[in-house]
């Protein structure tokens, strides 16, 4: 089975605080991976690097065999990498469709035409029997 995701020696520091110290792992296609650790262990920092929110100080990420630059959320999104936060909330000032769009795309995409997203939302609603 081929590798879906390879994290190679990822390190990230905030001043003197070492959040990630040469973290490496491989996730194969179809595998489910859980990252466990105490509060402050660096789990969220690692996820923020993977999703492009932070640039790592050292190391590399490969997604489906291609190097994924860190610190570039648009590239992670285009590769299909996303995250559901542990404590997520919906934005009350947005419609259901807009909340779904920002769960998949960046906030900038709210200014783009919503017709393709609406079509996809309706298809998924039908597929899963949602009103």
Labelled PLM ranges:
Residues 1-131:
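Glycine-rich phosphate-binding loops of nucleotide-dependent enzymes
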């Amino acid at each position: 089975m081929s590798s879906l995701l390879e994290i190679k020696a990822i390190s990230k520091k905030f001043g003197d605080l070492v959040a990630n110290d040469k973290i490496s792992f491989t996730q194969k296609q179809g595998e489910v991976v859980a990252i466990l650790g105490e509060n402050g262990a660096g789990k969220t920092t690692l996820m923020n690097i993977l999703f492009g929110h932070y640039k790592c100080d050292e190391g590399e990420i490969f997604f489906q065999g291609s190097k994924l630059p860190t610190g570039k959320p648009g590239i992670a999104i285009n590769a299909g990498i996303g995250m559901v936060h542990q404590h997520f909330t919906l934005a009350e000032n947005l419609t259901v469709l807009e909340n779904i769009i920002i769960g998949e795309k960046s906030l900038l995409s709210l200014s783009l035409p919503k017709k393709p997203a609406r079509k996809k939302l309706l298809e998924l609603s039908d597929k899963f029997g949602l009103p």
